[in-house]
C-alpha cells in the first residue's frame, strides 16, 4: 500500500447523545492511542472524554467544536503497513451545525451513529443530506443494543425511509436489552458473544450458522430466531458490494454497544477494508486528483486558543494532492503570496505533535496569525479555488454590543477571531451600522459570550432583532443590483467577506422582493 491507499479520513456524525464521542474513544482505544476511555457523561470519573477539549465542552459533556484525531491501525491477522486513520469527531449537540457541515467537506466517508431506541432524529437527516450532496459513502452503526430498543427491522426501514438510502446489514443482533447475547458478523461469518465490559475486547467464535454449536452458545430459541432473521435479511436486502457502498448507493449497517466496547472492532475492521482512500477534490477550475505530484489543500476550520496560555489560532488544512513538507514555501491563493510553516502539527485532540510531511487525506494544523479564512487554498503556485465550504442561512439573529467600553479592542479582536473560526455569521446592517450575529442554534450565542469573556477578557450583551431570513444576493446586471440595494436600503447588510446580504424581517417581505425584482438572484447558502 502506498501512502495514499493507507489513508482513511472520515467523520463520525450523529444526533446528540447517540454515542458518537464514545465510539470515537473506543476507536482510539483499539488504535492504541489511549489507555482508558473517558466515560463521557459521568462527572464522578476523573477522565473527561479525550476528544472534548474546550472548557465549555468539558462542563457540559457535549462536543461543540470538531476535534481531529489520527492513529495507525492494523486489523488482527493482517500483515503489512497499518492503515492511517484520521477521525473528525463532530459536534453532536443540535445547535452545532455549521462546523459539522464544513467538516463533511473534508472527509472521504462518514460513520453515522444511531440510537437503537430513538432511531433517526432530525439532525441525522440534515447531515445525511450534506453527505448526499457530496456523494459521501456512509456506514451506519446502530448503538446501545444492550438497552431495550426497537425491532432491528423497524430501525432499518426507518433508516431507508428517512435517510433515503438503501441499507445492508453486515452484522445482526441476537436479542437486545437484558436478553442481548451478541451479534453475528455477517461480513466475517463470526459469532461475537457479549460480555458487558467497558475496557475489554469481545470473545469471537467462528461458527457455521447451521451448526449445533450455535445452539449451545446462544440457546436453541435464540439460534432458531437468528437463522430465520438472517434468511430474511438475505432475502430483503441487496447483496453487499463494495462498489455500491463507495458510490454512496448502499449503506452497510452494524449493530453494537460502543460503551461496552461491543461491535466496535468489527466495525473498524470492516471500515478500513471497504472505506475509500482519499478521493479527487473538485476545484472551481478543475478536478484535483490525490496522486498528482504537486501539493494542494484547503482550510476547512480555524480554531482559536487550543492552549489558553498562548493566544494562538490553528487553521486545519485538508491535503488534497501531492505531499506537504514542513518549511517549504506554499502559495496562498487569496493573498497572492508565498507562506511557509515551521511547525505544522497533527492532533490527538489537544495533544499535538510537529510533523515533517503529510499526504492526501491527512489533516494538518497550521499556525495562523490572522492570514487564513475558511475556504482558503494553498498550492505550489497554481491559482485554484476549492469549492464546497458553504455558510447556511442562519435561523436565529441577535444584535451584539460591546458591554465594556474600556475593552473595545479585545471585543473587536475576539469577535473577529470567533467569526473567522466559523462559530457563527456576522452581518453589518448598512442602515444603522449595527452588528448582527446569525446562528443555527441558541447555544452558539452562549458559546460566543462565554468565549469572549474567558478567552478575550471582553464582555458582550445581546439585543433582540426581528429577522426572518438572511440571503446573499447577486445579479448579472450591475445596475439592477445597485437599484435593488437603493430601494431596499433598510434591509441591506454586508457579511464578513463584504458580500451583499438581504435581511428580510418577514416571509412576506422576502417573497415580495423576489417577485418585484426577478433579475436578482437570492441564495440561501453563501456558496454560489
What does each model-found stretch correspond to?
Residues 1-528:
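Structural and coupling elements of P-loop NTPases
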Amino acid at each position: 500500500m502506498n501512502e495514499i491507499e493507507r489513508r482513511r479520513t472520515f467523520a463520525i456524525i450523529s444526533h446528540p447523545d447517540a454515542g458518537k464521542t464514545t465510539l470515537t474513544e473506543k476507536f482510539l482505544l483499539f488504535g492504541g492511542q489511549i489507555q482508558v476511555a473517558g466515560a463521557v457523561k459521568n462527572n464522578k470519573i476523573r477522565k473527561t472524554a479525550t476528544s472534548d477539549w474546550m472548557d465549555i465542552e468539558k462542563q457540559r459533556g457535549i462536543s461543540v467544536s470538531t476535534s481531529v484525531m489520527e492513529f495507525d491501525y492494523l486489523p488482527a491477522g493482517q500483515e503489512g503497513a497499518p492503515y492511517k486513520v484520521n477521525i473528525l469527531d463532530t459536534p453532536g449537540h443540535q445547535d452545532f451545525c455549521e462546523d459539522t457541515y464544513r467538516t463533511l467537506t473534508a472527509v472521504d466517508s462518514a460513520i453515522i451513529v444511531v440510537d437503537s431506541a430513538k432511531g433517526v432524529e432530525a439532525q441525522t437527516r440534515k447531515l445525511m443530506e450534506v453527505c448526499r450532496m457530496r456523494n459521501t459513502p456512509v456506514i451506519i452503526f446502530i448503538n446501545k443494543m444492550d438497552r431495550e430498543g426497537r425491532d432491528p427491522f423497524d430501525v432499518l426501514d426507518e433508516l431507508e425511509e428517512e435517510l433515503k438510502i438503501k441499507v445492508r446489514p453486515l452484522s445482526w443482533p441476537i436479542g437486545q436489552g437484558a436478553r442481548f447475547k451478541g451479534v453475528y458478523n455477517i461480513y466475517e461469518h463470526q459469532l461475537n458473544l457479549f460480555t458487558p465490559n467497558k475496557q475489554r475486547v469481545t470473545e469471537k467464535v467462528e461458527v457455521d450458522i447451521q451448526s449445533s454449536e450455535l445452539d449451545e452458545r446462544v440457546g436453541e430459541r435464540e439460534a432458531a430466531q437468528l437463522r430465520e432473521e438472517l434468511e430474511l435479511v438475505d432475502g430483503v436486502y441487496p447483496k453487499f458490494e463494495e462498489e455500491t457502498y463507495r458510490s454512496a448507493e448502499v449503506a452497510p449497517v452494524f449493530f453494537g454497544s460502543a460503551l461496552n466496547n461491543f461491535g466496535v472492532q468489527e466495525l473498524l475492521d470492516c471500515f478500513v477494508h471497504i472505506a475509500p482512500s482519499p478521493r479527487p477534490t473538485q476545484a472551481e477550475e478543475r478536478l484535483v486528483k490525490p496522486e498528482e505530484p504537486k501539493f494542494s489543500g484547503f482550510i476547512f476550520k480555524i480554531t482559536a486558543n487550543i492552549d489558553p496560555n498562548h493566544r494562538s489560532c490553528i487553521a486545519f488544512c485538508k491535503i488534497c494532492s501531492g505531499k506537504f513538507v514542513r518549511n517549504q514555501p506554499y502559495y496562498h491563493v487569496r493573498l497572492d503570496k508565498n507562506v511557509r510553516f515551521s511547525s505544522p502539527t497533527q492532533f490527538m485532540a489537544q495533544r499535538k505533535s510537529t510533523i515533517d510531511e503529510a499526504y492526501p487525506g491527512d489533516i494538518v494544523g497550521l499556525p495562523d496569525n490572522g492570514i487564513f479564512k475558511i475556504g482558503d487554498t494553498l498550492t505550489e503556485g497554481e491559482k485554484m479555488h476549492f469549492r464546497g465550504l458553504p455558510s447556511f442561512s442562519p435561523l436565529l439573529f441577535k444584535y451584539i454590543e460591546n458591554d465594556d467600553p474600556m475593552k473595545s479592542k479585545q471585543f473587536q479582536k475576539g469577535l473577529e477571531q470567533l467569526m473567522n473560526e466559523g462559530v457563527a455569521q456576522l452581518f453589518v446592517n448598512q442602515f444603522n451600522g449595527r452588528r448582527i450575529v446569525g446562528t443555527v442554534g441558541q447555544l452558539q450565542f452562549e458559546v460566543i459570550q462565554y468565549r469572549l469573556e474567558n478567552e478575550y477578557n471582553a464582555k458582550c450583551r445581546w439585543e433582540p432583532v426581528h429577522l426572518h431570513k438572511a440571503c446573499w444576493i447577486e445579479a448579472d446586471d450591475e445596475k439592477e443590483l445597485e437599484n435593488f440595494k437603493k430601494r431596499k436600503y433598510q434591509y441591506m447588510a454586508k457579511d464578513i467577506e463584504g458580500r451583499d446580504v438581504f435581511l428580510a424581517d418577514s416571509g412576506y417581505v422576502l417573497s415580495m422582493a423576489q417577485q418585484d425584482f426577478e433579475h436578482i438572484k437570492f441564495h440561501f447558502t453563501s456558496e454560489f
